Design a protein with these regions (language model features):
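Alpha-helical transmembrane segments of multi-pass membrane proteins
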Residues: 103-115, 141-154, 167, 181-214, ...
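Membrane-interface interhelical connector segments
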Residues: 164-199, 433-454, 481-488, 492-493
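Membrane-embedded alpha-helical segments and adjacent helix-loop junctions characteristic
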Residues: 55-63, 67-140, 145-146, 395-489
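Long, contiguous bundles of hydrophobic transmembrane helices that form the permeation core
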Residues: 1-10, 211-363, 530-540, 548, ...
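Transmembrane helical segments that form the transport core of multi-pass membrane transport proteins
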Residues: 268, 298-464
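Structural signal for alpha-helical transmembrane segments and their membrane-water exit/capping regions
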Residues: 2-7, 17-53, 74-85, 276-287, ...
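Re-entrant/interfacial helical elements at transmembrane boundaries that shape
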Residues: 125-133, 149, 162-174, 220, ...
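Interfacial loop-to-helix junctions that mark the boundaries of transmembrane helices
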Residues: 1-6, 25-31, 54-66, 197-205, ...
Length: 589
């Protein structure tokens, strides 16, 4: 079959998502079953894989969906526990002392705290922690979800202590003789040095693209959720937003160059938190209290902004609790994530031991395997911390029981969307080996694009990485699928293939901004079920920016300078954004 036709067919399940979820605004619970059926139809009818393989991929998807629902439940339970104990009210007052300005708060929580959680745990965990915290502070649920999705970009490639590089890129490249020969020819004696070399390039690309992410967060927040529906209110804090961005990305790049791929996100975010919180307390670059920006009265909020989990001041207990005690559950979450993710501490191997791992190998006689390691899942940490909080905050049994009951009802509503979303993904990426002889759908699509773009491939490479993450819900899986393909394309068009692999990793991180099952999960955490398409519509421009800028920059780098198509496009993008911002600010009174 013609590669272009095959690529268009492979695009169909994604086109169904785009049409019904994003354009027609169907809820994910209705759109994703259609996408699943489309993927199954293609797998059986065009790729001609066996019914057993489709069934095995579906079962694996259901198992993964169950683990996601467990994580969502744990995150909701922790939020409801803090609501019932009164800690949320204390945390809210604490943030008011740092700054009552919602723009400052969202940058600290979503951009910095969220990046720290991403660096510690990865795999969408920031949405499970930062998004409900924002709702607890009084943000509309949809505003919190949009902010939580936007920051799942810069820190993602080094999330989970570098998993997308150390597992994703590593798995994709390490067994290929041509890649090994290339690394040795470039003087890398150790494979780990070669991975770190790619990691530095990834960090540089992220730092340049990520410099505007905090500004995107506040500008989109004021545009979609402010009383004035204006970008201006967000753009007014551009100095603080850029300062917060550099406070994280500068140490992020330094750490990538000196310590390797494990620590850029976690240490960059920690250093950034220390700098930005200290500066905010001292009033550096933050608006004066009388100029603080807030959402309008809740009575004026649109119904679509509000999730099933709504925290009202008059519902809160007023405990005698200090700020440290109120924050202690989140500190415990952060501590447990680090303790269980750093192998040298000795806990991670215990949690991943075969004795506490449930595996199903060769499902229905296929090569597909599924496994669950429940003690290692972030959901377990959330549940354990909730139980500790029950004792630590001296809660009553009745109020704690309410937290469990409300959490169970909320997570049930999200289950329909996820039990079709993840199986669709698994059928899509497990579609190789059929009688038709086609490669799996993601590779077929990527090869079709590569055949059309030719030497302009570096501009498109991040979009393939983003597509992989959009489908699979993981930068790591995207890198595993496409790193070798990207390396091969780079080598074929005569440019440094490590830059192309770096563009893949950056694009894979950007894909998390619009990834369907990440949006479903983040929305479910705050009870915002059925409005996933609206979230993606709001975050899609940020994804395009975050894929296009590194692509243009990468094209310029591999072609030796800025005086080429990539460099000119990069200048045009930033000039256009600057002109737009200046015009918006001129409208300001």
């Amino acid at each position: 079959m013609n590669p272009t036709v095959l690529a268009l067919l492979a695009l169909l399940p994604i086109a169904v998502v785009a049409l019904f979820l994003v354009v027609l605004r169907w809820p994910a619970s209705r759109a994703m079953p259609l996408s699943y059926l489309t993927a199954v139809g293609l797998a059986l009818g065009v790729w001609k894989i066996s019914g057993q393989q489709v069934a095995a991929a579906t079962v694996k998807g259901l198992i993964i969906a169950a683990t996601l629902l467990y994580i969502i439940f744990g995150a909701i339970l922790l939020l409801n526990t803090l609501q019932q104990s009164g800690a949320i009210r204390v945390i809210r007052k604490g943030f008011m002392n740092i700054s009552p300005d919602r723009r400052v708060q969202v940058i600290i929580i979503a951009w910095l705290f969220g990046s720290f959680i991403e660096g510690s745990a990865g795999f969408g965990t920031p949405a499970a922690v930062a998004v409900p915290l924002l709702v607890g502070l009084g943000f509309p649920a949809m505003a919190a979800v949009v902010a939580g999705m936007l920051i799942q970009s810069t820190p993602v490639s080094f999330g989970g202590l570098g998993t997308p590089i150390l597992v994703g890129v590593n798995t994709g490249l390490k067994d290929d003789a041509a890649v090994q020969a290339f690394a040795q020819a470039k003087g890398f004696e150790q494979w780990s040095e070669f991975l770190a070399h790619i990691g530095v390039k990834v960090a540089v690309l992220h730092a340049i693209a990520g410099i505007l992410i905090p500004l995107f967060v506040v500008a989109l927040m004021t545009r979609y959720f402010g009383s004035n529906r204006s970008f201006v209110d967000g753009l007014k804090v551009w100095k603080f937003a850029i300062f917060a961005s550099l406070s994280m990305t500068v140490p992020y790049v330094i750490v990538a160059r000196t310590l390797g791929p494990e620590f850029p996100s976690i240490l960059g975010a920690l250093i950034g938190l220390a700098i930005v919180v200290t500066a905010s307390k001292k009033g550096f670059l933050v608006p004066k209290k009388e100029d603080a920006w807030d959402f309008g009265p809740k009575e004026e909020w649109q119904p679509e902004w509000i999730g099933a989990i709504e925290i009202k001041d008059d519902d809160m207990v007023s405990p005698r609790m200090n700020l440290f005690l109120a924050w202690s559950p989140y500190l415990l979450v952060a501590a447990f994530l680090i303790i269980t993710r750093v192998p040298e501490l000795g806990v991670k191997p215990l949690l991943l031991h075969a004795a506490v791992t449930f595996s199903w190998t060769e499902i229905f006689g296929t090569d597909i395997t599924a496994k669950v390691q429940p003690l290692y899942l972030p959901g377990t940490i959330f549940v354990v911390v909730s139980l500790i909080t029950f004792a630590l905050h001296g809660m009553k049994g009745g109020s704690y029981g309410t937290a469990w009951a409300v959490s169970g009802r909320t997570v049930f509503k999200a289950s329909v969307a996820l039990i079709f979303t993840v199986p669709m993904v698994q059928v899509f990426i497990n579609s190789a080996g059929g009688l038709a002889g086609h490669d799996k759908m993601p590779i077929a699509l990527a090869e079709g694009v590569a055949g059309i773009t030719g030497s302009a491939w570096p501009i498109f490479a991040p979009f393939i990485g983003g597509f992989g993450a959009f489908v699979a819900g993981s930068n790591t899986v995207s890198n595993m699928m496409f790193s070798l393909f990207q390396f091969g394309v780079g080598d074929r068009i005569g440019v440094d293939p490590t830059w192309i692999v770096a563009l893949q990793a950056v694009g894979g991180a950007a894909g998390n901004i619009i990834c369907v099952h990440n949006v479903v999960a983040a929305s479910a955490v705050v009870g915002l079920v059925g409005r996933e398409g609206l979230v993606i519509r709001k975050t899609l421009p940020a994804f395009i920016y975050y894929a296009l800028v590194p692509g243009c920059l990468g094209f310029a780098i591999v072609n030796g300078g800025i005086l080429n198509v990539g460099g000119l496009m990069l200048v045009a993008i930033y000039a256009g954004l600057l002109i737009f911002a200046r015009k918006q600010l001129k409208k300001s009174p």
